[in-house]
UniProtKB/Swiss-Prot annotation:
This is Chaperonin GroEL. The keyword Lipid metabolism does not apply. Pfam families: Cpn60_TCP1 (PF00118). GO terms for molecular function: ATP binding; ATP-dependent protein folding chaperone; isomerase activity. Keywords: ATP-binding, Chaperone, Cytoplasm, Isomerase, Nucleotide-binding. One of its GO terms (biological process) is protein refolding. PROSITE patterns: CHAPERONINS_CPN60 (PS00296). ATP binds at residues 30-33, 51, 87-91, 415, 495. One of its GO terms (cellular component) is cytoplasm. The keyword Nucleus does not apply. It catalyses: ATP + H2O + a folded polypeptide = ADP + phosphate + an unfolded polypeptide. Forms a cylinder of 14 subunits composed of two heptameric rings stacked back-to-back. Interacts with the co-chaperonin GroES. It is found in: Cytoplasm.
Amino acid sequence: MAAKDVKFGNDARVKMLRGVNVLADAVKVTLGPKGRNVVLDKSFGAPTITKDGVSVAREIELEDKFENMGAQMVKEVASKANDAAGDGTTTATVLAQSIITEGLKAVAAGMNPMDLKRGIDQAVIAAVDELKKLSVPCSDSKAIAQVGTISANSDATVGELIAQAMEKVGKEGVITVEEGTGLQDELDVVEGMQFDRGYLSPYFINKPETGAVELESPFILLADKKISNIREMLPVLEAVAKAGKPLLIIAEDVEGEALATLVVNTMRGIVKVAAVKAPGFGDRRKAMLQDIAVLTGGTVISEEIGMELEKAGLEDMGQAKRVVINKDTTIIIDGTGEEATINGRVTQIRQQIEEATSDYDREKLQERVAKLAGGVAVLKVGAATEVEMKEKKARVEDALHATRAAVEEGVVAGGGVALVRVASKLAELRGQNEDQNVGIKVALRAMESPLRQIVSNAGEEPSVVTNNVKAGEGNYGYNAQTEEYGDMIDFGILDPTKVTRSALQYAASVAGLMITTECMVTDLPKGDAPDLGAGGGMGG
């Protein structure tokens, strides 16, 4: 086992604070509408330019092991805030730095660290309750666009696009961000159920100009098995041919003579058919087939429940207004499933989301809800260069998370104003002893730090502006973009309550642990192996 280096008391805390400050100072230059960019060097390719706090935090590793521990703990604050709300990472870092700096001053002055932490925790619990009282629901497109704009660093086009996307696919819809091909940002909305499986044979294509298969009012056969024998299919094909409608087959696979026969039938114009593989794998495939069945009003032909393909009739088929299939996606538009059944299925999947333990499962279930309930929107980010594209895509993703958080828990006045108002409401809060009162004061003073940093980044004097904002009430604050005072809601400067709440909670949690640190242990750097000199031998 390697030898350890151990530091105690003030020595340890001073080193830790130095690390905290290096990371926080690098992150906080990005805060607010006049925050600056940070350039991150990469081992290959062009440097990354970002205004995203968590991206900056993740890059920082310090040479001194003790300082690095301090920096890594604050990095945890930014990461946790990012995971919980998808934004607010810079605010969380600024709050943590302030609580740690003021808290360690109090410890150096002889306060009891445990009581300080209790005071900080008490203030944060009270502050979260006050934030919830200040919160206003965010339901209209205008408010959603404003939240998106602020989070995308005052880029109004991004805010507008996100608001449009949410309007089209609903609050439950899936919105994804992709790199576009042009200079302009674009929004693509896919209505209906889309999944990532294309046609099994290019001979099914009936729209050569677009390279797609389009079926109008088709029957949809859903089979949870491989189909390789055409005999099983004959009764279904005959029934569909009589009805004079096209047929879409969604099965585990269609191969061999079955696929060949379907192709021949299509080319001769006997029955218009297309076949695709079912989406997903294993149990997820079964669930997604069931989703498609619910959406189209059909039944999954599965041997597990004693159904055979040969005995399937038209009543087992699903139907839709239109189906479009290209090389790697299938879209089912306007399935004929009953509204009540679809809603029941959505409720059932939501229940599974509540119980899901892994993020991956939760995300996949969320996608299934969106496909049944809303639709899918794709935001294509346009930029002139690769470097700008990466930076912009990260901003758009942040803005998307922020708008989701706003819809979930509502919004409060932005620009650091909500926390200043909360702090003034808690001015009379008291703990059980003087040290706890100091802890409460540390937390309340920290709540001013985001506003101070926004003002400082805008090149103004933080104390003057903070006092002016404190003298006002309600949503009265300072717009750093235009350098004027007024109602933050009227200015369109809104922050999601969830983002502000998460930033405060995670900052206080980690800062409290750091204030109560008395000892730090790390590996000693490994020295070079001693030089043994030349070995003894025969002279001359």
